[in-house]
């Protein structure tokens, strides 16, 4: 809880609301301790609200299917063995709702869509990209965040410990971009628009229908060729 204390003190001293990443642990059933990759939203009055990462990185943060096959828990690849969260938490900033994606979650479209449908007006992303080094992964991860902004027509504020950071507008344009491996503080005004995109409302149905039409067309083409 030392991270919690430091972050809470910073929020209290500067009288600002603060969003930060932190590990957390909770005693669960049978006194078992569950560890989480979390984000914490603090207010100057000392109150906090937590979001626990729902989709963990396979083999880095957890072993897939280990809850169903106990022998998998004995495998050790140096993973963190976090417990996946289950609640899509919405934060409130002076009457404006927002949600936070943790690292790898920004690569999964349905998570961002779920948050927007729950009322989030914008999205933040906290990410540790240091594991990529100075590779193409850093830039690819940032470009993926642009897709989430355009898909849902919402602004995204992205903060990476080694960069790339910046404010991504609903059009995909980036404001106040901080390059890789550059220490900098930037202030951005986040435009709030309550416009629901086609993808936010209908999800992947368009892609599913197109796929089905393609498969049906191929099937009848194959039948015609055989006859």
Language model regions located:
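Active-site beta-loop-alpha substructure in enzyme catalytic cores
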Residues: 73-146
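Catalytic-core segment of enzymes that process non-peptidic bonds
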Residues: 11-97, 152-183
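Single conserved hydrophobic/aromatic residue that forms the stacking wall/gate
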Residues: 2-10, 14
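C-terminal beta-strand edge segments of enzyme domains
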Residues: 63, 142, 148-227
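A short, polar/proline- and glycine-enriched secondary-structure boundary/capping micro-motif
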Residues: 30-31, 59-63, 109-113, 135, ...
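Short beta-strands and strand-loop turn motifs
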Residues: 1, 21, 125-128
């Amino acid at each position: 809880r030392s991270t919690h204390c430091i972050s809470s003190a910073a929020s209290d001293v500067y009288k600002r609301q603060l969003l930060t990443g932190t590990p957390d642990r909770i005693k669960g059933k049978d006194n078992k301790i569950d560890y989480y990759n979390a984000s914490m939203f603090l207010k100057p009055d000392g109150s906090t609200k937590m979001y626990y990462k729902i989709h963990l990185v396979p083999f880095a943060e957890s072993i897939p299917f280990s809850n169903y096959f106990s022998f998998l828990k004995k495998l050790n690849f140096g993973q963190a063995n976090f417990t996946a969260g289950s609640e899509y938490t919405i934060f409130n900033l002076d009457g404006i709702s927002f949600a936070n994606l943790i690292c790898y979650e920004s690569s999964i479209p349905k998570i961002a869509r779920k948050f927007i449908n729950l009322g989030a007006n914008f999205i933040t992303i906290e990410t540790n990209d240091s594991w990529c080094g100075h590779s193409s992964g850093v830039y690819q991860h940032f470009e993926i965040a642009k897709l989430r902004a355009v898909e849902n027509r919402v602004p995204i504020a992205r903060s990476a410990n080694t960069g790339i950071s910046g404010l991504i507008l609903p059009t995909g344009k980036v404001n106040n971009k901080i390059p890789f491996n550059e220490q900098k503080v930037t202030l951005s005004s986040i435009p709030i628009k309550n416009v629901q995109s086609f993808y936010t409302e209908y999800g992947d149905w368009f892609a599913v229908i197109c796929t089905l039409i393609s498969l049906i067309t191929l099937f009848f083409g194959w039948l015609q060729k055989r006859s």
